[in-house]
């Protein structure tokens, strides 16, 4: 038996029928919606390669949470907002092309990626941190960055440039949430 799911993915309302109750959010995103930036690493919720951000109302405000899509069931996002790395880059009005979100720009400026497999997961954890802290005028300390990124593993770059990127977010222009 299947039930429909309704959620926002980025700025688009998704109405999906016939999603099996056994489907994980990762399976829904990669197999059904073609979101290839969401990676399957460990499939146990330990590496963070599959990180997406969920938004839900919390005391009248939108609260952002980075979650592992490999261990979250697809139907659990019903009536929520969801972002993947494909959803956060704003469009340039003049050219119509994507620009970089500040978290992506910070990672580029700090040379915080090598092979790139873990990068979308780090982008999304940084995006949640950005929305919950930087966009509200709060600086990000090294300790906060370490705590917020503790669910993401990188085997190539090391964590110093990634933590540097997190700490420079408040120095970049603010991005509007789509």
Residue ranges, per PLM feature:
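Signature of N-terminal electron-transfer/Fe-S-associated modules in redox systems
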Residues: 1-178
